[in-house]
Design a protein with these regions (language model features):
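Interdomain/boundary linker segments immediately adjacent to catalytic/signaling cores
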Residues: 1-51
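Non-catalytic C-terminal interaction segments of nucleic acid-processing enzymes
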Residues: 1-13, 73, 144-191
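Active-site metal-binding core of divalent-cation-utilizing nuclease and nuclease-like domains
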Residues: 28-43, 52-86, 97-101, 165-173, ...
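Hydrophobic, Leu/Ile/Phe/Ala-enriched alpha-helical segments that form helix-helix packing faces
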Residues: 42-54, 145-153
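Short, charge-rich binding segments
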Residues: 82, 109-111
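Structural motif
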Residues: 88-90
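Catalytic toxin/effector domains delivered as secreted proteins or via bacterial secretion systems
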Residues: 94, 106
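Nucleic-acid nuclease catalytic cores
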Residues: 96-101, 111-169
């Protein structure tokens, strides 16, 4: 089984661009204290914005639909929410450092079934140095890894703080490449 084919010119790509805008503007620092709170907050927002997407918003909090799972390594893995049956998978992770590695691995699994994968990595107050180091360029290997996932694998990552950041610091470090925008791939993550 290979990865689901994905073109960056389709209704799924249009949904991906809208989702990018939504994630960048979502107030993660006010949403909750655990992964389930963040998932519920974002899912509720996406459900209320469903008319902006061409694909159905499917979440685990909406009992009228079911998120499709991916079977890999003898286990079913299910993203937190999707746009469409095979279009876009969204996975939120409330991060400790080990959780970061697990989330990247899950992104690969979901890419088997879905055209695009959005990983939203929510950094806890206790792990704020991960966010600060990524913001200041000290986490170059992590930045390069997330950039590579975006440019070659269609796995788009967003690193967001679950805490209020200092003035002048970004509220979201996103790795999403849109060829419609001007700018080079080297600017990924710098928006």
């Amino acid at each position: 089984m290979g990865f689901e084919p994905a073109r960056r010119a389709s209704r799924h790509w249009d949904d991906a661009k809208q989702l990018d805008k939504t994630i960048r503007s979502f107030p993660f620092h006010t949403t909750g204290k655990n992964e389930r709170d963040f998932e519920t907050g974002l899912a509720t927002s996406l459900i209320t914005m469903k008319d902006l997407f061409s694909s159905q918003v499917i979440t685990q909090i909406d009992k009228s639909s079911t998120v499709r799972s991916v079977y890999c390594f003898g286990k079913k893995h299910r993203p937190d929410m999707t746009l469409g049956e095979s279009g876009i998978a969204l996975e939120l992770k409330f991060i400790t450092y080990a959780g970061l590695k697990d989330a990247i691995g899950q992104g690969y699994f979901y890419r088997l079934r879905y055209r695009f994968v959005f990983l939203i990595l929510i950094i806890s107050e206790q792990r704020r140095t991960i966010y600060e180091d990524l913001e200041t360029g000290k986490e170059k290997d992590l930045e390069d890894t997330l950039r590579h996932l975006a440019t070659t694998m269609n796995i788009f990552s967003y690193v967001v703080p679950a805490f209020v950041v200092k003035p002048g610091t970004r509220n979201c470090i996103g790795f999403f490449e849109d060829p419609d925008l001007t700018g080079s791939p080297s600017e990924l993550g710098r928006s």
